[in-house]
A protein has these predicted regions:
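A broad, structure-centric signal for solvent-exposed, well-ordered loop/edge residues
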Residues: 7-8, 42, 54, 320-323
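Bacterial N-terminal signal peptides that target proteins for export
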Residues: 1-9
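Bacterial N-terminal signal peptides
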Residues: 8-17
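Outer-membrane beta-barrel porins/channels
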Residues: 24-30, 167-447
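N-terminal, post-signal peptide beta-strand-biased segments of exported outer-membrane/organellar beta-barrel
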Residues: 20-173, 178, 447
């Protein structure tokens, strides 16, 4: 049991790193981290604005690197402190250890240690106060109670991990990889009051959690076109569009409701609580008939002297039809029971529409910019800039994340011929604390 728990924790950590990097690719690039998440180069903007494939690079700005390689100082430190060979006895992963802190473990998953934490956000302790009477139960989680989400909590969005293609005179033909993932849950009112507000447990009452998760992935043959329709390189109007034929390789969705119901007495009787759960799963596994759908990207960009403005929208009308889906139901109440509901049925899913509005101002070796980005799970705002002085680049930025919290980024880099070394710092409060931590990111860029 201990070995499997530790192994699952390490696997979750690795998946967390991959998910973070995939969902927000800038997390592996110290340049964008130093800008607070702002993407100033055309390579970053092309992801969300099809018109930018025709927009020339800004004068005086470094070109886009051919390859960015993160330097994972955080993982090196993490596995030095938590050797895999001793994972089953490590207090961080061994739930039987007196030093085990599940809040700290979850915090590690929410902030995968790809890079080095130079200031860790304080993690609430295990201190919990129980009030137990003859027929009453009350739990005071102390500082940890602030971490209990009051509203629906979730992560996810859409990403394009691969997008190779060939361009000829504004026409581009390629194959795009796509992934859509969503995970969310919400505490029932009774359980929320019990955990967050220390409301005493009541008899004959159900305490539950609602959950929902979606994962689908595939590829999309793409035809795109971008060109300047007015002006010249210094003052011009650019438009672009892309048509995708989405091919779905696999799809899964789970919706569930789990909890327990108290009896006539909190502690008396043979069954003081009765656990129960129900779930509905839909899936089209790899090897079934492919999903299919059509969607489009649209973009426009305006360049007028030192000012650049763009608006891009992705996955417009992208509805995926899965022709061979199976639906199962599962129920637990005293014992588990599952049964097929339907098979070989058609299911439709919809990719979230993402958009980016960006503004940049370049004068000499100074570039300032801002953007508003929504990739399917809330809106983020980035403002930042960089100053180039010879081989040195200085960067800084500020962001408002999806939870409307303000974060900061700063950093710099050195460029020697075709090789660049960058370092970036950013604050984060997505850990299980109301105070900020600071992470240092490092990466190599090959131009």
């Amino acid at each position: 049991m201990r070995t499997s728990f530790g192994g699952a924790a390490v696997l979750a950590l690795v998946v967390g790193c991959a998910t973070a990097a995939g969902a927000q690719g800038w997390l592996t690039d110290a340049r964008r981290i130093g800008l607070g998440g702002l993407g100033l180069d055309q390579g970053s903007l092309r992801r969300y604005n099809a018109a930018y494939r025709a927009v020339p690079g800004r004068a005086g700005q470094h070109g886009r690197p051919k390859l960015t390689i993160p330097i994972p100082l955080g993982l090196i430190q993490f596995f030095h402190d938590h050797p895999i060979s001793n994972i089953k006895n490590d207090p961080a992963f061994n739930h039987d250890s007196a030093g085990f802190n599940p809040v700290k473990l979850l915090n590690t998953f929410l902030n995968p240690p790809l890079f080095l934490e130079v200031k860790q956000a304080p993690t609430p302790t295990n201190d919990v106060v129980f009030g137990i009477g003859k027929d009453s139960l009350r739990v005071d989680l102390g500082q940890t109670a602030r971490l209990v989400p009051q509203d629906q909590f979730g992560i996810g969005g859409s990403s394009r991990p691969l997008d190779p293609g060939l361009s000829i005179k504004g026409v581009r033909v390629g194959v795009m990889g796509w992934v859509h993932d969503e995970v969310g849950f919400q505490l029932g009112d009774k359980l929320l009051g019990f955990l967050r507000d220390s409301v005493p447990a009541d008899t004959n009452t159900r305490y539950n959690v609602l959950g929902d998760a979606v994962l689908e992935a595939g590829f999309a043959p793409t035809v795109a076109y971008a060109r300047r329709i007015a002006g010249d390189n210094t003052t011009g109007l650019y438009v672009g569009g892309a048509l995708h034929y989405y091919v779905g390789l696999a799809y899964a969705r789970v919706s569930g409701d789990g909890g327990f119901t108290t009896g006539d007495s909190i502690f008396g009787g043979p069954t003081p609580v009765k656990p129960d759960a129900r779930a509905l799963t839909q899936y089209s596994k790899f090897g079934n008939s492919f999903g299919h759908g059509v969607g489009a990207d649209l973009g426009i960009a305006v360049v007028t002297g030192p000012i650049e403005l763009g608006v891009g929208v992705n996955d417009v009308g992208a509805t995926i039809t899965w022709p061979d889906t199976r639906v199962d139901s599962a129920l637990y109440r005293d014992s588990s029971f599952s049964k097929p509901v339907a098979n070989h049925i058609e299911t439709k899913t919809k990719l979230p529409v993402s958009y980016l509005v960006n503004l940049a101002y370049t004068v000499g070796k100074t570039t300032l910019g801002a953007d508003v980005l929504n990739s399917g799970r809330g809106t983020t705002v980035h403002i930042g800039g960089e100053q180039r002085v010879g081989v040195i680049v200085l960067r800084g930025g500020v962001a408002r994340d999806q939870r409307k919290r303000i974060e900061f980024g700063w950093g710099g880099g050195l460029r020697f011929g075709g090789l660049g070394l960058d370092v970036g710092f950013w604050t984060h409060t997505n850990s299980l604390s109301n105070q900020r931590g600071i992470t240092m990111a490092t990466s190599l860029a090959i131009y």
